[in-house]
């Protein structure tokens, strides 16, 4: 028999970030890395985790008497597609504008932004500038990746749940 093994099968997905020079060199110091939005950031740290959100139409949830934790009132997505670790400020801003338009909200109605916050220099700078240009300097922004690392496919669900809990408790987190 002949067996084939692709590089994709042999290497963990997380090694892609090493190849892109996007990972922190401070993995041995979890209390100081990753540091999203910090001048001492040096890249992301891969974390492990899992999460799931159950989404359903509001009317259906109400009809069955479900406890509703949160409602998604707007959504926006955009990608420049140029490079995985070099996002564009204008593209990030446009995604946030699309979400506001979909929700029929103004930027003034938003009180907190949970950013992607990978702790990569170019990503954090582009994200900060995009957020600042749309919401102004008053907007608090953080990312749970400072506590968990980048959990790859799980980060959207996990960070969404953390935001739901923060809204419920009317608190926001600081960065690690």
How should each PLM-predicted stretch be described?
Residues 56-59, 161-168:
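Short glycine/serine- and small hydrophobic-enriched flexible loop segments
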Residues 95-103, 134, 163, 167:
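Stable alpha-helical structural segments in soluble proteins, enriched in small hydrophobic residues
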Residues 75-80, 112-120, 145-152:
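A short beta-alpha structural unit
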Residues 12-34, 52, 78-94, 118-130, ...:
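Active-site-adjacent elements of ketosynthase-type condensing enzymes
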Residues 6, 10-16, 107-123, 138:
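Conserved beta-ketoacyl condensing-enzyme motif
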Residues 28-103, 111-112:
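Condensing-enzyme catalytic core mediating Claisen C-C bond formation in acyl metabolism
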Residues 1-9, 173-176:
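Single conserved hydrophobic/aromatic residue that forms the stacking wall/gate
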Residues 20-45, 128-158:
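Conserved catalytic cysteine-centered active-site region
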């Amino acid at each position: 028999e002949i067996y084939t093994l692709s590089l994709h099968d042999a290497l963990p997905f997380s090694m892609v970030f090493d190849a892109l020079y996007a990972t922190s060199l401070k993995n041995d110091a979890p209390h100081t890395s990753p540091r999203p939005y910090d001048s001492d950031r040096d890249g992301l740290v891969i974390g492990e985790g899992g999460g799931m959100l159950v989404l359903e139409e509001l009317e259906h949830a109400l009809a069955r008497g479900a406890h509703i934790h949160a409602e998604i009132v707007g959504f926006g997505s955009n990608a420049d597609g140029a490079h995985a670790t070099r996002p564009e400020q204008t593209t990030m801003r446009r995604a946030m504008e699309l979400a506001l338009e979909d929700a029929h909200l103004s930027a003034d109605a938003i009180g907190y932004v949970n950013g992607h916050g990978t702790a990569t220099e170019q990503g954090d700078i582009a994200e900060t500038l995009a957020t600042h240009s749309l919401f102004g300097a008053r907007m608090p922004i953080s990312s749970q990746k400072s506590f968990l690392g980048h959990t790859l496919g799980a980060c959207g669900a996990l960070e969404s749940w953390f935001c739901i809990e923060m809204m419920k408790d009317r608190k926001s987190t600081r960065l690690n």
